[in-house]
Amino acid sequence: MIEFDLLRTGAARPAAGADDLRRDLELDKIVAAASGGDELVAEVWREVLLLADASPDSISYRQDAVRDALRNRDAVLRLYKIANETVDAVQRRVFLFRPHDPVLVVHEAVNGLEVMVASLRDVLAVLKSAAFSSEAFRQMSKSVLDNINDEFLASAQQLVKILRFENGVQFSVKIGELNILENPVLLVPRKGGNNILSKMLRRDEYVYRLDPRDEAGAYILDDIRKWVLAKAASTVFKAFNHLNSFFEYLRRQLAFYVGAINLSGYFEKLGLPAAYPRLSKGALKFSNMYCLSLSISTGSRPVPYDLDVEVEGGFAVVVTGANRGGKTTFLKAVGQSLVLARAGLFVPADEFTLPSTGEVYTHFPRQEDKTLSYGKFEEEVKRFSAIVEGLRRGDYVLMDESFSSTNQVEASVVAEEVVAALVDSGVYVFYVTFLQDFLNRFLDRYREKAVLLVPEVRQDGTRTFRLVRGKPTPGYAIDIWKKYMAT
């Protein structure tokens, strides 16, 4: 039996905030770049990127497989093409519109088997020539090659030819009581059994020819044919389903790696760095990390980000500063890299180290819904409460101006209580905010577990859109006033 698992996602559930992640982190842009218009690749990528659970072992397993796929990209793309074309060909050639008719089931299943047996030969050829080294792809190759060889394929092709019944259905039966036919057994036609010499040497045999106008007789023969093929139909249909499931499973598993190959090509085209994330407890470090969705939108390399934090337990990265300084873009870049890292993929950075494989949550601004019976601040609190219900130690929460829909004093108090509780619970927080009171109190209280990033401004006032470590300054007072006080 062929068994393999290229993804090792198990029965992992989708992330609780999957829709928010797609929207806030612009993941659909990344998926579109990886899929290249292939809907199956897009579907599998959304599924893997938005997994709630990701263990260090599963991440390492997929990372090794991604590296292997990139080294053997021709083999992976060829296998995916074979699986895709096979599934499509079977869908075009097989029409089981009467599943209870044994004759039709055998005929249609054989149509599909003929296609798939030929494709198996192509799969074997690719696997024999490939040089896979990862556990995932070596396991797949071994399972296929251990169960399928040239002898098996030759036998399968011969069986398909026999099941065509080009010379009619040959079978034997026992004559039971009252001359009732019993125990039909399909017979394998003898080789050369229909040539002239064999007919000349054949002993006398009883032959009954049905009159062309005998409709009742034709119905009886049709019923006999169905009766004889009933058991065979079940076996043939199981074989068809088994092979069809193999090709569907193969192309779905490979789709993830086809997307990785496509995205790698995109990185090369734009000159983006590609790093495979490392896991190091208590450390968050990245250098020259780019916002991938922005790069996709602009077709260029945007301003990169750097950070190096060494702490035990939860911590907070707080970002503040003037509008249009790259703060939200930074938040998206972090979130995208975390999601890619958990999927076992490379990220757009020279280096990327994360402290845990926890789940990622986002709390970004939403347009006010006029149909709600409560205000915008209540909506923010309600949405954040839903996030808190699923949080665990080691998870990540990305907050973009959360709780800013109320006044500065109330917003600062709520923000301080929330962020402090998250950090104390071992959660990693990234928070973009203008709340000056919160910044002063929280950073003083959590100076060992928090870092403040501000947009870099040169001496001549030019903004570089890079973020550097800093401290709250009154220089952003006008921006804050415009944000919260202007009406």
What are these regions (language model features)?
Residues 1-172:
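Conserved amphipathic alpha-helical "coupling/scaffold" segments
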Residues 91, 233, 385-389:
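Regular secondary-structure segments
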Residues 51-91, 174-208, 343, 424, ...:
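An N-terminal domain-start capping segment
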Residues 95-289, 293:
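Conserved P-loop NTPase architecture
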Residues 75-86, 217-227, 444-447:
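An acidic intrinsically disordered interaction segment
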Residues 281-487:
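ATPase nucleotide-binding head domains, primarily ABC-like/P-loop NTPase cores
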Residues 1, 22, 257, 453-457:
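Assembly/interface hotspot detector across virion components, adhesins/toxins, and nucleic-acid enzymes
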Residues 26, 198, 447-449:
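Active-site regions of enzymes building and remodeling cell-envelope glycoconjugates
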